Amino acid sequence: MGISRRRTLQAAAVAALGGVGCARPADRRWWPDESQRHELTYMAWPTRRIWGSATDGVREDIARIARTVADFEPVTLLANRAEAGAARRACGSAVEVVPIPVDDLWMRDTGPTFVRGADHVAGVDLNFNGWGGKQEHARDGRVARAVLKGERVRRIKAPITAEGGALETDGEGTLLVTESSLVNDSRNPGMSRNAIERALKDLFGVTTVIWVKGVLGEDITDYHIDALARFSEPGVVVMSTPPEQAPRDVWTAAYDQARKVVDRAVDARGKRLEVVELPEPVDIGRRGEGFLACYVNYYVVNGGVVMPRFGDRKADRRAASIVRDLYPGREVVQLPVDHLGEGGGGIHCSTQQRPEVG
């Protein structure tokens, strides 16, 4: 099975230009927020070498996500050549399968992060290194470059090492990140937080970076922000809120610290942030310790939101209702993704959007 991504190591708009809808100089790049129109979504097919006996179940989850996203927008799924046929059969004709070598399915982290110019798109290659060398990544380390070459999209090689799941934008000049997944020697040896922040601002055209502490060394990602907090729109942060009966551990402490930071922070427009709590499920049954039970790892698609369902009916209904209120006019679809969750990841972790130009 893939290494657990949550509990254990074992198992861009620029604020100075004004508010929403403001004109941007032609020579500036920005990272659009996820709710902006997509050209398509990229995904990747899990390999048996990484997932072992869990492979079939994880592939069912990935195929289910791909088919669902394809109801809203085009999907391109990367697969090793020998497995492309199986991927096509599982995902159906609405999903394009392309033979690009991969190690694992976490396209949010291995794929390029797309930024916009006035009339073009470019891809930031964040130099994926297996979450700091914790997992074999010979193929995944080349995925971003391969995608951009195949699509004939300009590649921007980052001067830092990071993963897409470590970064969250409001599309209006603000970035939200966990320090634990960026300021560490397994990714950026010898680099200070200030140096990394300068690189992030340049890469994504942001002017404000909000840092929360995160958790170092307890999961393979060192606690990505997309399992903790998301922007639903400029000025609104959706936070994965532990239930009252949750144990006092490093994860609840990380939430408490992040909540204090977000409550005090201002965005690139100089405005305070509103926090919307998205409570985690109370009952997750017999799932393992590394199971990722958070609803904020949803994915916003054209006209919809694809989010997890965990089987705690009260919590599932409440989460869907909150997300509908956050994204009015979008269809909310909940999917069971238990096999993916046992690997410590979720729907957002397995997808990567390419923004529409124009």
Show which residues each predicted segment covers.
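The feature marks the mature, well-folded catalytic cores of soluble enzymes
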Residues: 26-358
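N-terminal export signals
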Residues: 7-24
